[in-house]
Amino acid sequence: MSRKNKKIKKKIFIDTRYNSRIVAKFANRMMYDGKKSISESILYSSIDLLADKLEDSDKMAVFYKALDNIKPLVEVRSRRVGGATYQVPVEVREERREALAMKWIIFAARKSSGRSMKEKLSNELLNAYNSTGAAFKKKEDTHRMAEANKAFTHYRW
């Protein structure tokens, strides 16, 4: 049994516009220097831009599907056994899946070239919805790495 105290989870307030915990977490993850209102306005306008590009569908359904397409199922963790370090594939918890998907989408949007962050983010969300783009490539690379190291699954802890 662990000697450490269990970490108390912070209560994430739901988003005011879409009444969604996931949208609120996404805005928090995008935030720089505590400027949440700027982060929220960028996110809302990029979701609206995304809805304009896909005019026939529900914008929140598109947002959630884009996140689901990026969520990784497995990842590799380093495990030291007898002087050698192995990359051991481990299944990812649901909360971490969400966090990684958000992180990868935001990182890909920031790295891409474009005029404004709302346009870059809406393009990356559209790419994620269509299972393309840099964030989807990151997920595929993670899955490929886990598949390549499948022989070391018995080192799981």
Swiss-Prot record:
InterPro entries named in the record:
Ribosomal_uS7, Ribosomal_uS7_bac/org-type, Ribosomal_uS7_CS, Ribosomal_uS7_dom, Ribosomal_uS7_dom_sf
- What are the record keywords, sorted? Ribonucleoprotein, Ribosomal protein, RNA-binding, rRNA-binding, tRNA-binding
Pfam families this protein is in?
Ribosomal_S7
Q: Tell me which SUPFAM superfamilies the record gives.
A: Ribosomal protein S7
Give this protein's Gene Ontology molecular function annotations: rRNA binding; structural constituent of ribosome; tRNA binding
NCBIfam families from the UniProt entry? rpsG_bact
Please describe what this protein does: One of the primary rRNA binding proteins, it binds directly to 16S rRNA where it nucleates assembly of the head domain of the 30S subunit. Is located at the subunit interface close to the decoding center, probably blocks exit of the E-site tRNA.
Q: Which family does it belong to?
A: Belongs to the universal ribosomal protein uS7 family.
Name it. Answer: Small ribosomal subunit protein uS7
Q: What is the lineage of its organism?
A: Bacteria, Pseudomonadati, Spirochaetota, Spirochaetia, Spirochaetales
